[in-house]
From Swiss-Prot:
One function term, GO molecular function aspect: exopolyphosphatase activity
UniProt name for this protein: 5'/3'-nucleotidase SurE
Family named by the database record: Belongs to the SurE nucleotidase family.
Annotated function: Nucleotidase with a broad substrate specificity as it can dephosphorylate various ribo- and deoxyribonucleoside 5'-monophosphates and ribonucleoside 3'-monophosphates with highest affinity to 3'-AMP. Also hydrolyzes polyphosphate (exopolyphosphatase activity) with the preference for short-chain-length substrates (P20-25). Might be involved in the regulation of dNTP and NTP pools, and in the turnover of 3'-mononucleotides produced by numerous intracellular RNases (T1, T2, and F) during the degradation of various RNAs.
Pfam families documented for this protein: SurE
Entry note: cofactor: Binds 1 divalent metal cation per subunit.
GO CC, alphabetical: cytoplasm
Main location: cytoplasm
Stored NCBIfam families: PRK00346.1-1, PRK00346.1-3, PRK00346.1-4, surE
Sorted UniProt keywords: Cytoplasm, Hydrolase, Metal-binding, Nucleotide-binding
Length: 254
């Protein structure tokens, strides 16, 4: 039976992870290791300035107190889950992780940590907060496909599911990340003691939502599957940077 480490960034009791855990447990061995609270936007942060403790809930799920999604996967793979899991699944996230969202997403970061530790990894997000069961069924289908036809690309699959009943989903599309306009909104107010308080505003509007993007696929009713990689090297830019250094007469010396 496939051993799955299931995590998220919305917190261990969030509806997305609980619906997905219930669906996966029908056919797989699932261990939930997730933050004890909402850690959306935590990206790939690791906790290095203090110790971490865990709490095992009545249903066997493990919450990491004050931990990030990356902490949860790191601890789960390296210490808490025995035998070692065979795949990391992150989600179901409440809301999409499209375009630039992947930079900040704790959901994607949890999957990325799983891949960094040598495991296949899926990040699952729902473009809303109603049809978690649809996203759970899509995840089960993807896992069945991975078992019958293994994917050897070594990538993270970032999966975004339209917030629709399953029968209204049109199919799968392999996509690239689109992009958003830069977010600039900041909300502020003054507390009774005169201190200024600030809240970061919503993400920017869509900028690149062309036909091959994750934005377009989800908007048209398709499940978007975007392969992501841990290696952030911009290989096509290496020659440009070498030429730039040569023109600046640096020649590789400081």
């Amino acid at each position: 039976m496939l051993r799955i480490l299931l995590s998220n960034d919305d917190g261990v009791t969030a509806p997305g992870i609980q619906v997905l855990a219930a669906a996966l447990r029908e056919n797989y061995h699932v261990q939930v290791v997730a933050p004890d609270r909402n850690r959306s936007g935590a990206s790939n942060a690791l906790t290095l300035d203090r110790s971490l403790s865990v709490n095992t809930l009545e249903n066997g799920d493990i919450s990491v107190l004050g931990g990030t999604p990356t902490d949860c996967v790191y601890l789960g793979v390296n210490r808490l889950v025995l035998p070692r899991p065979e795949i990391v699944v992150s989600g179901i996230n409440r809301g999409p992780n499209l375009g630039d969202d992947v930079i900040y997403s704790g959901t994607v970061a949890a999957a990325m940590e799983g891949r960094h530790l040598g495991l296949p990894a899926l990040a699952i997000s729902l473009n809303g907060e109603l049809h978690y069961q649809t996203a759970a069924e899509i995840t089960c289908r993807l896992l069945q496909m991975l078992q019958t036809t293994p994917l050897r690309a070594g990538n993270i699959l970032n999966v975004n599911v339209p917030d629709l009943p399953l029968e209204h989903i049109k199919g799968f599309r392999v996509t690239r990340c689109g992009s958003r306009h830069a977010a600039e909104e900041v909300y502020s107010m003054q507390d009774p003691k005169g201190n200024m308080l600030y809240w970061l505003g919503p993400p920017g509007d869509k900028h690149d939502a062309g036909p091959e993007t994750d934005f377009a696929a989800v908007e048209q009713g398709y499940v978007s599957i975007t392969p992501l990689q841990v290696d952030l090297t911009a290989y096509k830019a290496q020659a440009l940077v070498r030429d730039w250094l040569a023109k600046a007469e640096v020649d590789g010396e400081c």
